[in-house]
Amino acid sequence: MKAISVLGSTGSIGTQTLQIAEEFPDQFKIVALTAGKNLDLVTKQIETHQPEVVSLADESLLPELTRRINSLNEDSKILKKPLLMAGAEGLNTAAAWGSADLVVTGIVGCAGLLPTLAAIEAGKDLALANKETLIAAGPVVIPALKKSGSRLLPADSEHSAIFQCLQGTPWADNARLSTGVPTPGFKSIQLTASGGAFRDWKAEDLVKATVEDATSHPNWSMGKKITVDSATLMNKGLEVIEAHYLFGLSYDQIEIIIHPQSIIHSMVELDDSSVLAQLGWPDMKLPILYCLSWPSRLKTPWPRLKLTQIGNLTFKEPDTNKYPCMELAYSAGKSGGTMPAVLNAANEKAVELFLEERFKFIDIPKVIEAICEKHKCDLNLNPSLSEILEIDNWAREEVLDYSEKNIKKMQF
């Protein structure tokens, strides 16, 4: 049985991970949970999974959670009360929890960086759903992985697809250890993108896009932030940077293709012109399950893919005029150093302000480009962890400053 720590248990990745654990109780045991403010949900999770440690983001909520846990214990609904913690200390403790074999990092944004490093330093294997960790701190995370021997298993659908395609090839060991894919015989990877909420919109109509429009994904069920990232195609741009670090590829070896049906999750092209692809229904539980069960595969009762029912699979190149965030990500990745951290932080803050209706959808790439341009003169090609965290804070403050100075022309 594999013991699992779930960081971000009440979010999209976390809840799906726990659903899988419930479906396979003889395979997975949840030993640690971290959550935000959803006490009702985390209380149910504690009752169902009976973890050894639970951490909340907000320390002020601990007394109420303690009361609820005491009630569960008195009613014999849990056998043993978990250790309760809060804040950064609790998050890092859960990430490095002694009995955990695998840590699922489902925390959104750069907040997942420090607990990810804590898990790596403790020698834990990682199911990485928090792409921002590698994007912002790849220069720190990859050396830490190599030093500790921790294995990094990608939990998002596209990188999981690449990872699965590489199994059974000469590059399998390199992929799962994040030591890079050797060049001989290996040509490129192709990351597929659904096109997001606005794939059928004309570029000139995006000026009218609302928050409700941007958070309505045609294929996937995800959180609001990542759904907006899908609409701007920044999500795919960030995945390009993530793939660079995961598989040791140059940016010229990573291509983005629009595939509206989201059935082919990504492809690997070899030097002999062969293409390996991984197919499946657009369901995040599939790549999460593969991370949890790897190197084995578990039989599921889930719907089977029947290509005859789908009929057509279509593909097209992304429109760079419609999706400027994609090119911003390529540019930041090629610049290297602290630029991806600036891109990521600026995007996180810009999306947050858009969701608050502080400015328009079309302003997201404008803000990000302005902040990245401002950072060029201070680019650090070999940053430390503290320098990455500092530049992350700087970029967020710059987005706020930019929005305040331009608020009148940016508002809905």
From Swiss-Prot:
<keyword id="KW-0414">Isoprene biosynthesis</keyword>
<dbReference type="InterPro" id="IPR026877">
    <property type="entry name" value="DXPR_C"/>
</dbReference>
<dbReference type="InterPro" id="IPR013512">
    <property type="entry name" value="DXP_reductoisomerase_N"/>
</dbReference>
<feature type="binding site">
    <location>
        <position position="239"/>
    </location>
    <ligand>
        <name>Mn(2+)</name>
    </ligand>
</feature>
<keyword id="KW-0464">Manganese</keyword>
<feature type="binding site">
    <location>
        <position position="131"/>
    </location>
    <ligand>
        <name>1-deoxy-D-xylulose 5-phosphate</name>
    </ligand>
</feature>
<feature type="binding site">
    <location>
        <position position="223"/>
    </location>
    <ligand>
        <name>NADPH</name>
    </ligand>
</feature>
<protein>
    <recommendedName>
        <fullName>1-deoxy-D-xylulose 5-phosphate reductoisomerase</fullName>
        <ecNumber>1.1.1.267</ecNumber>
    </recommendedName>
</protein>
<dbReference type="InterPro" id="IPR036291">
    <property type="entry name" value="NAD(P)-bd_dom_sf"/>
</dbReference>
<keyword id="KW-0560">Oxidoreductase</keyword>
<dbReference type="InterPro" id="IPR013644">
    <property type="entry name" value="DXP_reductoisomerase_C"/>
</dbReference>
<feature type="binding site">
    <location>
        <position position="36"/>
    </location>
    <ligand>
        <name>NADPH</name>
    </ligand>
</feature>
<dbReference type="Pfam" id="PF13288">
    <property type="entry name" value="DXPR_C"/>
</dbReference>
<feature type="binding site">
    <location>
        <position position="236"/>
    </location>
    <ligand>
        <name>1-deoxy-D-xylulose 5-phosphate</name>
    </ligand>
</feature>
<feature type="binding site">
    <location>
        <position position="158"/>
    </location>
    <ligand>
        <name>1-deoxy-D-xylulose 5-phosphate</name>
    </ligand>
</feature>
<dbReference type="Pfam" id="PF02670">
    <property type="entry name" value="DXP_reductoisom"/>
</dbReference>
<keyword id="KW-0479">Metal-binding</keyword>
<dbReference type="GO" id="GO:0070402">
    <property type="term" value="F:NADPH binding"/>
</dbReference>
<feature type="binding site">
    <location>
        <position position="37"/>
    </location>
    <ligand>
        <name>NADPH</name>
    </ligand>
</feature>
<feature type="binding site">
    <location>
        <position position="230"/>
    </location>
    <ligand>
        <name>1-deoxy-D-xylulose 5-phosphate</name>
    </ligand>
</feature>
<dbReference type="GO" id="GO:0030145">
    <property type="term" value="F:manganese ion binding"/>
</dbReference>
<feature type="binding site">
    <location>
        <position position="156"/>
    </location>
    <ligand>
        <name>Mn(2+)</name>
    </ligand>
</feature>
<comment type="function">
    <text>Catalyzes the NADPH-dependent rearrangement and reduction of 1-deoxy-D-xylulose-5-phosphate (DXP) to 2-C-methyl-D-erythritol 4-phosphate (MEP).</text>
</comment>
<feature type="binding site">
    <location>
        <position position="11"/>
    </location>
    <ligand>
        <name>NADPH</name>
    </ligand>
</feature>
<feature type="binding site">
    <location>
        <position position="132"/>
    </location>
    <ligand>
        <name>NADPH</name>
    </ligand>
</feature>
<feature type="binding site">
    <location>
        <position position="10"/>
    </location>
    <ligand>
        <name>NADPH</name>
    </ligand>
</feature>
<feature type="binding site">
    <location>
        <position position="235"/>
    </location>
    <ligand>
        <name>1-deoxy-D-xylulose 5-phosphate</name>
    </ligand>
</feature>
<feature type="binding site">
    <location>
        <position position="194"/>
    </location>
    <ligand>
        <name>1-deoxy-D-xylulose 5-phosphate</name>
    </ligand>
</feature>
<keyword id="KW-0521">NADP</keyword>
<comment type="pathway">
    <text>Isoprenoid biosynthesis; isopentenyl diphosphate biosynthesis via DXP pathway; isopentenyl diphosphate from 1-deoxy-D-xylulose 5-phosphate: step 1/6.</text>
</comment>
<feature type="binding site">
    <location>
        <position position="130"/>
    </location>
    <ligand>
        <name>NADPH</name>
    </ligand>
</feature>
<dbReference type="GO" id="GO:0051484">
    <property type="term" value="P:isopentenyl diphosphate biosynthetic process, methylerythritol 4-phosphate pathway involved in terpenoid biosynthetic process"/>
</dbReference>
<feature type="binding site">
    <location>
        <position position="12"/>
    </location>
    <ligand>
        <name>NADPH</name>
    </ligand>
</feature>
<feature type="binding site">
    <location>
        <position position="217"/>
    </location>
    <ligand>
        <name>1-deoxy-D-xylulose 5-phosphate</name>
    </ligand>
</feature>
<feature type="binding site">
    <location>
        <position position="239"/>
    </location>
    <ligand>
        <name>1-deoxy-D-xylulose 5-phosphate</name>
    </ligand>
</feature>
<dbReference type="Pfam" id="PF08436">
    <property type="entry name" value="DXP_redisom_C"/>
</dbReference>
<dbReference type="GO" id="GO:0030604">
    <property type="term" value="F:1-deoxy-D-xylulose-5-phosphate reductoisomerase activity"/>
</dbReference>
<comment type="similarity">
    <text>Belongs to the DXR family.</text>
</comment>
<feature type="binding site">
    <location>
        <position position="38"/>
    </location>
    <ligand>
        <name>NADPH</name>
    </ligand>
</feature>
<feature type="binding site">
    <location>
        <position position="13"/>
    </location>
    <ligand>
        <name>NADPH</name>
    </ligand>
</feature>
<feature type="binding site">
    <location>
        <position position="158"/>
    </location>
    <ligand>
        <name>Mn(2+)</name>
    </ligand>
</feature>
<feature type="binding site">
    <location>
        <position position="157"/>
    </location>
    <ligand>
        <name>1-deoxy-D-xylulose 5-phosphate</name>
    </ligand>
</feature>
